[in-house]
Amino acid sequence: MRLLTTFGALLLMVACSPEPQPIAYGTDFCDFCRMTIVDKQHAAELVTTKGRVYKFDAIECQVQYLQQHQEVEFSHFLVTDYASTEGGLFAAEDCTYLISPNLSSPMGANLTGFADQKIAQQFQAEKTGELYDWSSLQAHFAK
């Protein structure tokens, strides 16, 4: 009986663990601006510690949503990589961000995320603009 109780508790913990979900491009709506998410190079996602998933059509929507919901605890901050056309999600804290007037994003902030810092630097050299890490990006949008 004790083994069954332990197994049940373990199963409950695994079933409730907050996990990211794939974005259904062309179907899912942005939880900030309500536009349909179609751009695989600018999308983003948040997952709360309780497992609720929020999806965004642009990183700037995600950042603004975070600023308006500071009381919510998030377990995952995810963004897509501009250099990839696959639409896969990467940990936002590990990415590099470029704000460039020569590289537009869906909501007009000209904000693009890169999983690889060297590729971000290459785009900066070509397109100009300013590079940010996750925390400096939050500070930039808090102004």
Please place each PLM-identified region on the residue numbering.
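Sec-dependent signal peptide recognition
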Residues: M1-A9
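C-terminal motif of bacterial Sec signal peptides marking the signal peptidase cleavage site
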Residues: L12-A15
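Bacterial signal peptide processing site
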Residues: S17-E19
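Short metal-coordination and nucleic-acid-contact micro-motifs, chiefly zinc-binding Cys/His arrays
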Residues: G26
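Post-signal-peptide N-terminal segment of Sec-exported extracytoplasmic proteins
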Residues: D31-E71
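Short aromatic-glycine-(Arg/Gly/Cys) micro-motifs in beta-strand/loop hairpins
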Residues: Q41-V47, E93-P106
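Mature extracytoplasmic domains of secretory-pathway proteins
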Residues: K55-E93, Y97
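C-terminal partner/receptor-binding element of secreted or periplasmic proteins
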Residues: A115-K143
